[in-house]
Amino acid sequence: MAYTQTATTSALLDTVRGNNTLVNDLAKRRLYDTAVDEFNARDRRPKVNFSKVISEEQTLIATRAYPEFQITFYNTQNAVHSLAGGLRSLELEYLMMQIPYGSLTYDIGGNFASHLFKGRAYVHCCMPNLDVRDIMRHEGQKDSIELYLSRLERGNKVVPNFQKEAFDRYAETPDEVVCHSTFQTCTHQQVENTGRVYAIALHSIYDIPADEFGAALLRKNVHVCYAAFHFSENLLLEDSHVNLDEINACFSRDGDKLTFSFASESTLNYCHSYSNILKYVCKTYFPASNREVYMKEFLVTRVNTWFCKFSRIDTFLLYKGVAHKGVNSEQFYSAMEDAWHYKKTLAMCNSERILLEDSSSVNYWFPKMRDMVIVPLFDISLDTSKRTRKEVLVSKDFVFTVLNHIRTYQAKALTYSNVLSFVESIRSRVIINGVTARSEWDVDKSLLQSLSMTFFLHTKLAVLKDELLISKFSLGPKSVSQHVWDEISLAFGNAFPSIKERLLNRKLIKVSGDALEIRVPDLYVTFHDRLVTEYKTSVDMPVLDIRKRMEETEVMYNALSELSVLKESDKFDVDVFSRMCQTLEVDPMTAAKVIVAVMSNESGLTLTFEQPTEANVALALKDSEKASEGALVVTSRDVEEPSMKGSMARGELQLAGLSGDQPESSYTRNEEIESLEQFHMATASSLIRKQMSSIVYTGPIKVQQMKNFIDSLVASLSAAVSNLVKILKDTAAIDLETRQKFGVLDVATKRWLIKPLAKNHAWGVIETHARKYHVALLEYDEHGVVTCDSWRRVAVSSESMVYSDMAKLRTLRRLLRDGEPHVSSAKVVLVDGVPGCGKTKEILSKVNFEEDLILVPGKQAAEMIKRRANASGIIQATRDNVRTVDSFIMNYGKGTRCQFKRLFIDEGLMLHTGCVNFLVSMSLCEIAYVYGDTQQIPYINRVSGFPYPAHFAKIEVDEVETRRTTLRCPADITHYLNRRYEGYVMCTSSVKKSVSQEMVSGAAMINPVSKPLNGKVLTFTQSDKEALLSRGYTDVHTVHEVQGETYADVSLVRLTPTPVSIIAGDSPHVLVALSRHTQTLKYYTVVMDPLVSIIRDLEKLSSYLLDMYKVDAGTQXQLQVDSVFKGSNLFVAAPKTGDISDMQFYYDKCLPGNSTMLNNYDAVTMRLTDISLNVKDCILDFSKSVAAPKDPIKPLIPMVRTAAEMPRQTGLLENLVAMIKRNFNSPELSGIIDIENTASLVVDKFFDSYLLKEKRKPNKNVSLFCRESLNRWLEKQEQVTIGQLADFDFVDLPAVDQYRHMIKAQPKQKLDTSIQSEYPALQTIVYHSKKINAIFGPLFSELTRQMLESIDSSKFLFFTRKTPAQIEDFFGDLDSHVPMDILELDISKYDKSQNEFHCAVEYEIWRRLGLEDFLGEVWKQGHRKTTLKDYTAGIKTCLWYQRKSGDVTTFIGNTVIIAACLASMLPMEKIIKGAFCGDDSLLYFPKGCEFPDIQHTANLMWNFEAKLFRKQYGYFCGRYVIHHDRGCIVYYDPLKLISKLGAKHIKDWDHLEEFRRSLCDVANSLNNCAYYTQLDDAVSEVHKTAPPGSFVYKSLVKYLSDKVLFRSLFIDGSC
């Protein structure tokens, strides 16, 4: 073992010394491979030939500047400015490298010959002749092409293939290659180009005005433009001459004229505008239109050349969130933009941003200017006194090194000679550790004397200024000023005899008699400051006159804002709207509100057209007489003989009026349709409707749905007749698929020209010999169809098998009263159940066949229900009480019974909502149960072009019940159902995995022989179904046909390879297909589709996960033990133990990660960094954007680390963020509500549920507004409030719709981990003035007092000014032995979710309590459309409704609303106890009560984002309500208490003591440790990670009860 270690050590030492040959060979090989790879990579770079003669140093410059190219230097051509000319080729190639090859490119002022030589046929050059130099250059390029071609010809060569396309294009259409127009006026357009367009500008951008550049790029549809130009930082100094040493060129500036030339050459100079170049350097945005701008971004600087790119930006993506594309979208937003411009001062004109306002950007793009400052140098002529001034760039470190050193000189040593000596010494050398080294500052030696003078003057004047500030007195016979002059003369001696003259002329000093004033000038300015100054003085900012049309544009802007909420607002013709308002003299805001109400279906009518075009609106506004012209009629007959064969068409009946869109008086008819025979021999043209439905539907939503249903029947009949007429007109041109649906009989030959699949059609369309078309009811004999002599052909179809539509139209027409359908008052309950939840089983268990009715959509379902109901042998279900929907409507009134107690509609959501409303009305029932599945296949509109608005598809119900346990579906399908349904879906099936899939190579592979299919065969489409039936499969149906059915095994087949829209991840057809089986499902498909992906995901699920969805029903027994004592809490004093670390540990376990958040400077970070906010309409005063500085107060520092934040400083940004997150973030969830009627019903339930029966009517003998009520209100107010009312005379009402806005400085702590990912917004306070509160405060205080006295206090607690002890007394009589459901309704954004409906409910409550009508109306208008003003932050906005957080009714109003909301949704007659406080509620119900879908009702009716929780212990107002066998105890939330101990707003020790006392008051019950175990259970129910916390509860008691010990939780922040 020792030998092995020795050998290993020796080998390692040899390797380290380099003696190991194997390792050495491997290293050499590695080095060789690396070198080869590197050379190969370099060889793949683009190759550029550099033919001009340049020096070796210039060769190195070019190579280092452009490492992207492999440059070959030939040095075979002498030329002027050789380096610059050669670099121009490299610059061109570098720019073209940025552009995708083959994309249309515009070379602005470019060299078209270079592109031809490179074979770039996709480049167009704009080469305007702006001076004679340009003409000469263009001719030179043509000569180079001729020279190249002549060389090829001389050598008998042809143009290479890569150049041929470009040269052919130049020879055939030279204008496509080059034009002599400026880029702004170029007319070239390459029509065949479909990709993005690019542009380059190589040293040509100087000649394009910067203000026109963006528009010119947009006109050419340029996506990105790459540019290169010469520039030098020194141009921003006061120097008139700047050298570009690397390319031996120079800039000369004379005013705005900037000349570029090459040194020591006689070539012509280039002249440009200095201000124009400065714009390209400094500006970031170049506007192209009112929507798009080009944003400049610098890329790189190489050899005095700056490269940048201009990218096209769509600003609508920034402001709107999505890009709106439409026919008239540009017009709409243009109008919005115009209104904005007039409304806001210089809205976008002054928004021009200078990129270089950021110092870091200046240092990056001007690297030579980093740490450099501009220092002035002065000079003056002794003869003429003419002053001169120039500036130089000097290292900032050099300047302060000199100043700091010479400021230490004594007065006698501070001479110009000493300063010059020091400056010269540190410039020439520096001594480091006794060794002389070269100076780090490379300052021009010719400037040292002038710089020394500047340093000396600055230091001398600074010293004198300090002395003058101290000594303002005379010294002997000389004044102070005289002493100063003596000192200066003594310092300079005879070298500068006119120092005084110089100082006076430079205005460095001022002399007035004997008084001397010295002003020390700024020694330097930074390059960044000079750059901004030069730009602002050189560029005139645009000015816009905003005074004209202010009032008109304000109104139009508000109207357009109102219209912008429409879904298709970008397609609304704004110009027509504006002209309409002007012509008709209509207020635009009124017109806009009407349009929004109509288009949003909030006006009591529905417009069915898809687009709000002028034609559609005009049709909707036609009067009834004009609308009836050309309408559809049904001709009836006079019965001349018993047979229908000789019927003739006489008289008219208006079918269009069936929908109720025209009054009864407009009908033209001989008689009512009393039988189907009156359809016989009706002309086909009378039944074919060009207008599918009414344009306008009026009335309640149920009435509109019923009218739409009648119109759908008319449209279906019209479509069927129209198709039959088409078949008769062109029988020979029918394709194979159409032949399967139709039949055509030739009457003369009695032969079917097209044989129908079915027989015995009920009706058809006949063609007479006169080529007239009529509808005929068909009769049959032993020879077939009975015909007339005048008939030529008869056409039938699958739609004419029964009289369905005709019979239903006849029945529904009888039900109309004055053209309006009757709406039943019966209660409608929607039972929403998942597939297989037992809806049919539930119907059979509930139904009483003697008095109830069951309706189903299809015959199979009806027979199945009859079979199951009569399975016991007793016939209960008959044709009278179990019927199909069509049968019930068609044969209405013919049965033995016409009235039923309850109606059960199975799969009711597959029906037209209007049909459901008719069924409820026709059955005369008291309550109707509509069973369905909101996620499965809904009603499908089969008539193309018939309008079925989205809000018509939503059934109107009074109550919703959910069923979320499936008895059919296996566990894997249950997992899929949980993704589609809200709530937890469970199953009872023992089958876990049931689905599989098989990819079939082609449709022909599926046949009964080679591919027998197991179980029920289903398809998605009718075509696939017919294909399978034709191949020999039996019992095949579509998914839509078997909705509601159950099968053990299912084979699902797809033969169609083309995309099918109903096969999608969220398609209801897929849901139905997956949920029909109980054992297995196999999917056979010819293509990959979303269903394959779903099945593959389900196949991968683990059995452990699937076990979670299993429900086992069992019997549970509860052991009950009665206690000896009841009525009082057992008290056990809590021991005072524990430490600070206990509280920290508990907090970290409950809210992990919160204590690690360093959020002390979050507010500062938000103010200093860029922020993007989505703001609704508001007015901002940016003069308030910088808050007034305040003396910082250092608060006490908590020892317990929590998520508490520092107090925020009120300001524009902070207040705006709070307003956006609070007031501007209100949800919009509610459906269509009849506000007044619904509010009245809700208030009825409120009074019935909460108020004592004898006190439900107001006491009219008590005055609400009297001296006593005012005095009671004043007793509760502070002296400051009363003082504000000193000048109020109570004569007139202030503006009740005006509110003030403010924020709370301290953010509210949340007991979750959201602080780790979001910036918590402050709570907003919106409040009235004290004058308004003085009027309505006493009034609502009295109303509140009367209401609370009327509440049934034995069952309900309205938590207003109640103590924890009173809460314990209220819940103290709960019987813990009685099983209870404890419910909590959690509502987010409670205040901001309240809308017009909530206001209507609250006002109705106050009205019934006795609120006077006038004051009630004033208060109502003051809460409708309100104006908010934040004077501190400079914000003004308008809000509709919403609860005002600082209102006199804020607390009691919120309490009343939450109570009314729960009363409308829950059975309050069963409640045991209920408590309400603001948005908090706690309800105790008996175990097992059925509750509706609270979330659904809260969303649609109350606009609340609500969740209903079932708890073991209640949580109310930050307290845990622990009920036990002796009563009830209320514990303050210990986690909330610990969170407060991390407060960072405690000012001083006195404030801390007040804080401790307030905590002691609320946490007093923690002193009783008898129920700590129940408290642990309650906390763990809310916070899953909370450990048992008795140790921390005792620690809290210990610190809260000891004043001195409590101080140890904080330390002094000022130390």
UniProtKB/Swiss-Prot annotation:
It catalyses: RNA(n) + a ribonucleoside 5'-triphosphate = RNA(n+1) + diphosphate; ATP + H2O = ADP + phosphate + H(+). Its EC number is 2.1.1.-, 2.7.7.-, 2.7.7.48, 3.6.4.13. Residues 72-281 form the Alphavirus-like MT domain. Residues 964-1116 form the (+)RNA virus helicase C-terminal domain. This protein is translated as a fusion protein by episodic readthrough of a termination codon. When readthrough of the terminator codon TGA occurs between the codons for Gln-1116 and Gln-1118, this results in the addition of the RdRp region to the replicase. One of its GO terms (molecular function) is RNA-directed RNA polymerase activity. SUPFAM superfamilies: DNA/RNA polymerases, P-loop containing nucleoside triphosphate hydrolases. CDD domains: Virgaviridae_RdRp (cd23251). Keywords: ATP-binding, Helicase, Host-virus interaction, Hydrolase, Inhibition of host innate immune response by virus, Nucleotide-binding, Nucleotidyltransferase, RNA-directed RNA polymerase, Suppressor of RNA silencing, Transferase, Viral immunoevasion, Viral RNA replication. PROSITE patterns: ALPHAVIRUS_MT, PSRV_HELICASE, RDRP_SSRNA_POS. Residues 1380-1493 form the RdRp catalytic domain. Gene3D superfamilies: 3.30.450.420, P-loop containing nucleotide triphosphate hydrolases (3.40.50.300). Heterodimer of a large and a small subunit. One of its GO terms (biological process) is viral RNA genome replication. The keyword Aminoacyl-tRNA synthetase does not apply. A ribonucleoside 5'-triphosphate binds at residues 833-840. Residues 801-963 form the (+)RNA virus helicase ATP-binding domain. This is Replicase large subunit. Belongs to the ssRNA positive-strand viruses RNA-directed RNA polymerase family.
